[in-house]
Amino acid sequence: VVYLGDNLYDAGLPSEAYSRYSDIKAALDSQINLLKGTQAKGYMIPGNHDWENGRAGGYEAIMRQQAYVDQFGEGKIEFYPKEGCPGPVEVEIGDDVVLVMMDSQWWIHQNDKPGIESDCEYKTEDEVISELEDILNRNYNKLILLATHHPFKSNGPHGGYFTWKQHIFPFTEMRENLYIPLPIIGSAYPI
């Protein structure tokens, strides 16, 4: 089982002092408990919401989430990449299958995150790309499953692609039949 991020919506795992901590951690418990008592192995990668939706404090939030999963996952579920590092992390699933996990939020996070000064195995974008190329070349004859939160390429809104209807009639996103044409302003809405 691979959890592809946004494991705790809306802003990751808060400190235990936060008034809603118990409610928020219950969502994480449900994901962990799903695997207990089974033969399944689980992997959890962070998404932008686990990094406090890209805000300051995001690094601390994923460190709390990793510590929680490590403590209560009982070896059934692993949080990767570790320590807020970008990855890639390579896991052999079988003789012919390799799971490669990366933290895609690391690439776009504007606040504190591990970098050159960190203990991460790969500290820069170039090092991450080089290792990813090495993994792909080393496993060219296997099925490679690449697990990240954000898609590498998207033909949808996350990739910057919108339909003509979204550009001309942006209010139809809010109400199905609200066809008020806004040809210039409407193009700014999806952005």
Segments from the language model and where they lie:
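Active-site beta-strand/loop signature of hydrolases that rely on acidic residues for catalysis
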Residues: 1-12, 47-49, 149
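Histidine-centered catalytic micro-motifs
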Residues: 146-153
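Extended active-site neighborhood of metal-dependent phosphoesterases/phosphodiesterases
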Residues: 12-140, 144, 158-191
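Short, glycine/acidic-enriched loop or turn micro-motifs at the edges of active sites
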Residues: 9, 106, 152
